[in-house]
Amino acid sequence: PSALAARERGVPIVNIAQPFKSSGLQLTCRKDTGIKSPSDFRGKTIGVWFFGNEYPFLSWMSQLGIPTNGGSDGVTVLKQGFNVDPLLQKQADCISTMTYNEYWQVIDAGVSPDDLVVFKYQDQGVATLEDGIYVLEDRLKDADFQDQMVRFVRASMKGWKWAEANPDAAADIVLDNDATGAQTEKHQRRMMGEIAKLTAGSNGTLDPADYERTVSTLL
């Protein structure tokens, strides 16, 4: 979504590869808020990532007819940082999470999956493409640069497909190169296992149908 928005603003970027076939974006809600379906969002506070992730959320709420300016009939949008604190501290009823990362941070913080309700954008029909590889359009006029990008995309997709087939080994490579020591084997292996579900089915080509779905979701 942010790439489309940038293009609309006049930034001449083009997609040269789309490793991710499916969306990992979801809303994770506390069950004790009484939320059982999207219609229960009214009157609730929802943490939303910006930097492009707000576009599918706002489109989703528009489709549901739910205002995003607060009030008992709408939702209050909390501009969420890239953490899960608003849910853990009960500042928000729902927060944005990725299937492969922040959701598991909530679980690792001691919250049982049974105490959560999850709404995957993919299941709600409002999924948009994520994590493509982009370049400035003018650069592609350079034959040498174009050749470099062809080889780069081929190598990248070869790596993604290897990681799909060998998630634990891929996670171990990340751990071996973690200079901070902050990453854990459990989290990295779990992340790669979930990411493999999102890259599955992609050969790196931008599927026109997926592109059109993204555009229609945002309109």
Residue ranges with predicted function:
Residues N101-E102, D123-V126, R139-K141, G159:
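Short, catalytically relevant binding-site loops at active-site mouths
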Residues P1-Q89, D93-Y100, F119-Y121, V126-A127:
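Short, glycine-/small- and polar/acidic-enriched structural segments
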Residues Q105-D123, A127-T128:
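Extracytoplasmic/periplasmic substrate-binding proteins
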Residues R7, K31, T45, F50, ...:
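Sec/Tat-exported extracytoplasmic proteins
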Residues K141-L219:
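Secondary-structure end/capping motifs
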Residues S96-T97, V126-E137, V153-M157:
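Active-site-proximal catalytic alpha-helix in oxidoreductases
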Residues L25-I35, L129-Q146:
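A bilobed periplasmic-binding-protein/Venus flytrap-type ligand-binding module shared by bacterial periplasmic
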